[in-house]
Amino acid sequence: MQSKLFILLFVASMIFHVRLSAQQDTTVTLKSKASSKALMKDTLDGKFDFSSFLIDAKGFIPVPFIITEPAVGGFGLAVVPMFLTPKKRPPGYKGYIAPDITAGFAMYTVNKSWALGGMRIGSIPAKGLKYRIGGGIADLNLSFYRDVTDKGEKEFAFSVKTVPLLFSLSKKITKQDVYFGLQYFFAKNKLTPLFVDSLPSSIQSDELESNVASLGTFVDWDRRDNFFTADKGARINVLYSANDNWTGSDFTYQKLSAALNLFIPVKKTWISGFRVESNFAFGDPPFYALPSLVLRGVPAVRFQGYTTALVETEQRFDLSLRWSAVAFAGLGKALEQDESFGEAETAYNFGGGFRYLIARAFRIRTGIDIAKGPDSFGWYIVFGHNWNR
């Protein structure tokens, strides 16, 4: 759950981690033609477009968000003031260079969940370094699901007060955009039951007020042609982390996660995307830190286990320069410690939506998805790609 909490806290920072290409000529043309009265129109087709505003605002983006995550009530509002600082290209450097991003974040939802946070995402291209620093505070009302003897699956609602901190640093180790890095995550957590029944046997009372702190190593290979809405390419990320007394954690456990995102241009107007992801927990993690399935239409932490695995596909069909239709579907399983793959319940999702090319110069698409899961519907406002985490 700790990764999901960080997604909720810093969703804007993640989705704005755009990789700006070397198209300086396009940027300059847009800026020279845009007038103060036409900042929201594209110079190419005269349609509504955010590109000139982003350029003329010198990197400042005051972004409002509607939160649609079912786990925190299905509706809420967030404000994300953000600054983007373009990087200078070192001599001989090829490929994309992401801007430095400094962002704040404030949110409130209908189930009285709230969060405040901030994050800095930056790089030193000449040294082949990338870094992330983030922190926040949150009070989230979340439901967890556990099997109870003779009663089947039951919902247990908690107020989750958490103060998370994150730091990561990675170094480019090959010419093929492979980065190796270290990541430290700390969270001070206090969970208060919002139910009158006793705790299930799978939840221990000493887990309700505790610290988790992990030190991890990761490898990241990213050859997508654009972070926001890739038309081709792939990304592979593998992370191993350990929680122990020496890291500052009250628990001893380890996690291993691996993810692949692949984008194939079947046609110029048809982009086929595939996602494969698996997570493993070893040792004795607290119940809220167990891996969970992340699928549209499935509330956060709805399916947890010591092992999770999922596959998902998303097909994008470009109907015109601006408008696209998307369709997606996925399957996943969350396995308990002594549960076989065949015994675990299968979670699924399917749905569709639309995208609008809202910033052509940056290839940013935004839209709405409607998804069906095993026992719920969900709708999501998407900025960039849903898999950007």
Residue ranges and their predicted role:
Residues F53-P62, I66-N211, R363-R365, A371-R389:
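Gram-negative/organellar outer-membrane beta-barrel architecture
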Residues F60, L77-V79, W114-G118, K161-F167, ...:
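Hydrophobic, lipid-facing positions within transmembrane beta-strands of outer-membrane proteins
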